[in-house]
């Protein structure tokens, strides 16, 4: 049974036990919000981005991460729960991007760029007529570096021991998948291009300003220590730099 600090302090039996051990929980103030502002241009880009990341009809379909869902049945049969797994992965990627943009613009730009490259890699595979499905290999890297021959050799060697590996042709996918993937890539390319031009990050600027003028002041922070939590490691690494 889990107990909160309030439970322990309010329950006489628990409280007396804590007192006998000399254990005291400090009183913690409620979190205080720090607001930051976006200029009109950045605000418009942010709103457009949230629509493209989340809108069911107008937005990205995350098809790069749903390839096995759109395989024809004879190929799809080897993957258990293909539809459920694909939808879960697409939802995970959408959630990740939404969380990244609220973590920091730096983290979002890095994630968006990787997603764009990954989607481009799959469009190139379709254009070349061979689509590689190998969850345990970094297919994107091989394709973007034009090392398909090396990838194919490795996949053939691993295929007897790795049942997830599949070498497909464009015809192995149901109609509409390649077109949907291309649509995703075009949206991502435009979005990525817009965000890579953005150098400002009002949230980070406001945090640094508060760090310099307020958060480490002895009046509110006697120990002058601060623990920073973030949704993304790339955000905290960027702050350190």
Where would I find each of the regions flagged by the language model?
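Inter-lobe coupling linker of SF2 helicases/translocases
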Residues: 1-146
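Non-catalytic helical/coil scaffold and regulatory linker elements
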Residues: 10, 120-179, 186-193
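Long, low-complexity, polar/charged, intrinsically disordered or flexibly structured peripheral segments
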Residues: 52-75, 156-200, 220
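Asp/Glu-centered strand-loop micro-motifs enriched in Gly/Pro and often flanked by an aromatic residue
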Residues: 80-88, 193-197, 212-217
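Conserved phosphate/pyrophosphate-binding and hydrolysis machinery centered on Walker-type P-loop NTPases
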Residues: 83, 87, 91-94, 98, ...
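Amphipathic, well-packed alpha-helical segments that form the structural scaffold of globular domains
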Residues: 102, 186-189, 193, 205-216, ...
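Conserved interdomain hinge at the start of the Helicase C-terminal
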Residues: 199-231
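Conserved helicase motor "Helicase C" RecA-like lobe of SF1/SF2 P-loop NTPases
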Residues: 232-241
């Amino acid at each position: 049974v889990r107990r909160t600090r309030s439970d322990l302090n309010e329950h006489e039996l628990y409280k007396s036990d804590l007192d006998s051990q000399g254990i005291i929980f400090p009183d913690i103030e409620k979190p205080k919000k720090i607001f930051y502002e976006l200029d009109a241009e950045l605000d418009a880009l942010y709103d457009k981005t949230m629509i493209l990341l989340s809108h069911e009809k107008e937005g990205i379909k995350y098809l790069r991460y749903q390839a096995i869902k759109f395989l024809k049945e004879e190929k799809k049969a080897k993957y258990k729960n293909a539809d459920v797994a694909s939808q879960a992965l697409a939802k995970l990627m959408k959630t990740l991007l939404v969380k990244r943009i609220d973590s920091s613009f730096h983290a979002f730009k890095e994630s968006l760029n990787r997603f764009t490259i990954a989607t481009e890699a799959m469009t190139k595979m379709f254009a070349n007529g061979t689509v590689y499905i190998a969850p345990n290999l970094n297919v994107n890297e091989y394709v973007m570096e034009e090392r398909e021959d090396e990838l194919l050799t490795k996949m053939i060697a691993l295929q007897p021991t790795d049942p997830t590996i599949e070498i497909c042709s464009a015809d192995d996918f149901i109609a509409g998948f390649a077109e949907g993937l291309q649509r995703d890539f075009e949206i991502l390319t435009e979005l990525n291009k817009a965000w890579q031009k953005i150098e400002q990050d009002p949230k980070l600027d406001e945090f640094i300003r508060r760090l310099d003028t307020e958060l480490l002041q002895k009046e509110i922070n006697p120990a002058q220590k601060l623990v920073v939590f973030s949704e993304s490691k790339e955000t905290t690494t960027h702050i350190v730099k």
